[in-house]
Amino acid sequence: MKQTVYTASPESQQIHVWSLNHEGTLTLVQVVDVPGQVQPMVVSPDKRYLYVGVRPEFRVLAYRIAPDDGALTFAAESALPGSPTHISTDHHGRFVFVGSYNAGNVSVTRLQDGLPVELVDVVERLDGCHSANITPDNRTLWVPALKQDRICLFTLSDDGHLVAQEPAEVNTVEGAGPRHMVFHPNRQYAYCVNELNSSVDVWQLKNPHGEIECVQTLDMMPADFSDTRWAADIHITPDGRHLYACDRTASLITVFSVSEDGSVLSVEGFQPTEAQPRGFNIDNSGKYLIAAGQKSHHIAVYEITGTQGLLTEKGRYAVGQGPMWVVVNAY
């Protein structure tokens, strides 16, 4: 299995393309100059395209991924109704979802042969919209509205329109600020990192009709932490055994173990990392975690070790200015 790591650095308007080997070493393959401040990125389900959001001219760009080394070639672009904060796709590669924090909306762009061709829907009044997350069954889009302390639930129609479910939303505790999410591989639980109080909520998907319930909330900060809380990103290993979330003020990654059924998280430790970690990701083998330091202008590679999933640093690498996003592609 070959793996490629992509890092987005908006201040220098660059994407760095790296080859990741089995020992956790990165080798630079390409530096792409992007026409705009590049932030969120996602790989298409068929692994042929990288979709990225740019500003100040709000667009989604599509790059073809070379099958031999992961290098990028520009392919297409499509306008967006707001500054892109988060980007994702449905599991069939038919639609791109973009959340915009500043515009307070989520948009749906139709894909044709892997390329973005037209905007098909926009939902407004989602204050602080920070991500758009499709459920494993490809039926429901979960959209955290950070400033409203709620996660909005939409059914994805066949033509890409978003229809509010019943109930149309679930609420976090006041002042939590729900931000990014991941789903457990067993499809029965979701995990949301809350930016403003640096906690993680565990949501149980109780039935196929969208009924969900918060079954656990866990503080992700050390007991002696007293500074401003500012959580950012969250990811889970492919086997569902380990979960990680980062806080930018503390510049740390919190390590969680996950119960076998996915319902319970336990804090296992805290890993100091690059300054102001805005984004990170986990490779497809579940062996390595790559974190980006927005203020250090470096990325660090960690090996995930032992039954607790603790992190051991393998190396760090200079990237562009202000790196914010990391994605990994396996082929």
UniProtKB/Swiss-Prot annotation:
GO CC term (a single one): cytosol
Entries under Pfam families matching the protein: Lactonase (PF10282)
Pathway: Carbohydrate degradation; pentose phosphate pathway; D-ribulose 5-phosphate from D-glucose 6-phosphate (oxidative stage): step 2/3
E.C. numbers: 3.1.1.31
Gene3D superfamilies (UniProt xref): YVTN repeat-like/Quinoprotein amine dehydrogenase
UniProt-listed InterPro entries: 6-phosphogluconolactonase_YbhE, Cycloisomerase_2, Lactonase_7-beta_prop, N2O_reductase_N, WD40/YVTN_repeat-like_dom_sf
NCBIfam families with a match to the protein in the record: PRK11028.1
Physiological role: Catalyzes the hydrolysis of 6-phosphogluconolactone to 6-phosphogluconate.
Annotated protein name in UniProt: 6-phosphogluconolactonase
Source organism of this protein record: Salmonella paratyphi B (strain ATCC BAA-1250 / SPB7)
Primary gene name: pgl
